[in-house]
Amino acid sequence: MPRRGPVPKRDVLPDPIYGSKLVTKLINKTMVDGKKSLAEKICYRAFDIIREKTGRDPLEVFEEAMKNVMPVLEVRPRRVGGANYQVPVEVRPERRQSLAIRWIVNYARERNGRSMEEKLAAEIMDAANGVGGAVKKKEDTHKMAEANKAFAHYRW
C-alpha cells in the first residue's frame, strides 16, 4: 500500500477505428510480449470476421458478449478460526469488465486449430449467443457463489 495516498487510475484511450475503450482493453489483453500492432491486427480482423458471419456491427456483438460474460458474484477466501471459507462477494464494475475480457481472450486461446483472429471471433460470437467457454466460466463462478451462500455473513 502506498504511503502517499491512492495511486491515480490510468485511463485508456479509445481505439481509433471503433472509438471504444472496451476495444482498447481487448487489444491490450490480446497483446503478447508488448506487440501491440499485432494484437490490433488480430482484434480488428476478428471484428471483420464477426461482421461477415453475423451481418451485425461487431462492436454491438462484442458488447452483447461482454454482457453475457460479466460476473455479478464471485467467491473470495476468508480465514476464520483456522478454516478457509469461500465467501461470496459482489464484483466491482471495473473488475467485472476486466474478468469478462480476460475470460474471452483466454478461452479463445484455448480453442483448437485455426488462427487467433478466427478463434477470438468465434469466442466473441459464442459469448454473444450465451454459449462458449467464457460464459460457462461465469456460470461456474455464480454456482460457486450460490453454493457458498451460507458463508455470506463473513463478508468484509
From Swiss-Prot:
UniProt cross-references to Pfam families, sorted A to Z: Ribosomal_S7 (PF00177)
InterPro entries documented for this protein: Ribosomal_uS7 (IPR000235), Ribosomal_uS7_bac/org-type (IPR005717), Ribosomal_uS7_CS (IPR020606), Ribosomal_uS7_dom (IPR023798), Ribosomal_uS7_dom_sf (IPR036823)
Record-annotated disulphide pairs: none
Key words, A-Z: Ribonucleoprotein, Ribosomal protein, RNA-binding, rRNA-binding, tRNA-binding
GO cellular component: small ribosomal subunit
Domain of life where this protein originates: Bacteria
Biological process annotations from GO: translation
Gene3D superfamilies from the UniProt entry: Ribosomal protein S7 domain
UniProt-listed SUPFAM superfamilies: Ribosomal protein S7 (SSF47973)
GO molecular function: rRNA binding; structural constituent of ribosome; tRNA binding
Family named by the database record: Belongs to the universal ribosomal protein uS7 family.
Functional note: One of the primary rRNA binding proteins, it binds directly to 16S rRNA where it nucleates assembly of the head domain of the 30S subunit. Is located at the subunit interface close to the decoding center, probably blocks exit of the E-site tRNA.
Subunit record text: Part of the 30S ribosomal subunit. Contacts proteins S9 and S11.
Name of the featured protein: Small ribosomal subunit protein uS7
Organism: Carboxydothermus hydrogenoformans (strain ATCC BAA-161 / DSM 6008 / Z-2901)
